[in-house]
Amino acid sequence: MKTLNRRDFPGAQYPERIIQFGEGNFLRAFVDWQIDLLNEHTDLNSGVVVVRPIETSFPPSLSTQDGLYTTIIRGLNEKGEAVSDARLIRSVNREISVYSEYDEFLKLAHNPEMRFVFSNTTEAGISYHAGDKFDDAPAVSYPAKLTRLLFERFSHFNGALDKGWIIIPCELIDYNGDALRELVLRYAQEWALPEAFIQWLDQANSFCSTLVDRIVTGYPRDEVAKLEEELGYHDGFLDTAEHFYLFVIQGPKSLATELRLDKYPLNVLIVDDIKPYKERKVAILNGAHTALVPVAFQAGLDTVGEAMNDAEICAFVEKAIYEEIIPVLDLPRDELESFASAVTGRFRNPYIKHQLLSIALNGMTKFRTRILPQLLAGQKANGTLPARLTFALAALIAFYRGERNGETYPVQDDAHWLERYQQLWSQYRDRVIGTQELVAIVLAEKDHWEQDLTQVPGLVEQVANDLDAILEKGMREAVRPLC
């Protein structure tokens, strides 16, 4: 069986205009996949040079396949049909290691055509590393490497204002563009680089904050033989991902034209502020997950897909989204409903087995950040507690018993909550406390909730009533009136 290379698989090759820090599965099935579509359907005509930002020899270099690899995008499409689409990606030209090819790395700045910098160096990548110096070959941190590369470009083109870059980080931190820019400026000042360079950074370059959204399942280890048989070639960099994707970029409106988004419709939004989109994702996608998990798991289900194929549990989640979460969010309702529809479709993806117990990790913090804001906003707006979000809190407290149908299961959270719940449920079983007292103790934890939730009118009583129903009737019977 042939292995991918450009000699045996000839096709388009594009001039290098994009530098990408990070060789991982996510960028390859997200950014490079989108660039490949734009190259095919528009005159974007841009090739990617991947820079491996850390010192590692695994996985091998993409250059062993001349930058070629296959994405397999699968899930439910907009009509709810299961689809699986294999695509040979030609947007990546080569990969270089900043550690073994440092001079080659600096030479990227000399190419007048270079225009974009994308990155995904993990959440820890956009951080300050004390001791990084200008002359290090290379510096340790990604922001320091980028500062050095930007200075190389500034010097090579004598500070020309038309030679700046559009820098688009994809790391999962809030306002990642602002954070990266601040660190680049910090290194520039620490290294005593000329004031003219600092002015050029501001005038000629754009640091764009982003929100990225796609589940990338990566190399399909268990299915490789079958997939390669279907493809007819060997691919050591096969990359799988869900059908849904969303790329929100906070940047200049001109970016849409530069990326040729006006010529081919991708799910990319160029916006003035990513905040409402971040809130939408946290509230609807993450919030629905967090509400679903303790209810579905204690109803005897194990995966998100099983839960969405269960008529009652699915109805509970959809009503929570449409009746209790969406009404208190600050974006146009039709936009929110369209996003919610995509979310429930993603939950039904038959190609992804998303274990409920793995999503249950750190459930107490997830409830505080993902659901509590909507629960409180709903109470404030309507004067009544949103029934399903409140029930989800009772289900969460019940989940920390760590037992389903007489069998124990692992509960993963910080030590404080594990010990606290062990103690509280033990006291409940010994009849030292009742449900009302148990709930009040949990809701009074100011350090966790950042407020005393026992002061929210009716909350302790309603959560305790829901908890009683769960303990007495079982989850199925208790949740039914809310479905």
From Swiss-Prot:
PANTHER family: ALTRONATE OXIDOREDUCTASE-RELATED, MANNITOL-1-PHOSPHATE 5-DEHYDROGENASE. InterPro entries: 6-PGluconate_DH-like_C_sf, 6PGD_dom2, Altronate_OxRdtase, Mannitol_DH_C, Mannitol_DH_N, NAD(P)-bd_dom_sf. One of its GO terms (molecular function) is mannitol-1-phosphate 5-dehydrogenase activity. The gene is uxaB. NAD(+) binds at I18, I19, Q20, F21, G22, E23, G24, N25, F26, L27, R28, A29. GO terms for cellular component: cytosol. This is Altronate oxidoreductase. It comes from Escherichia coli O1:K1 / APEC. One of its GO terms (biological process) is D-galacturonate catabolic process.
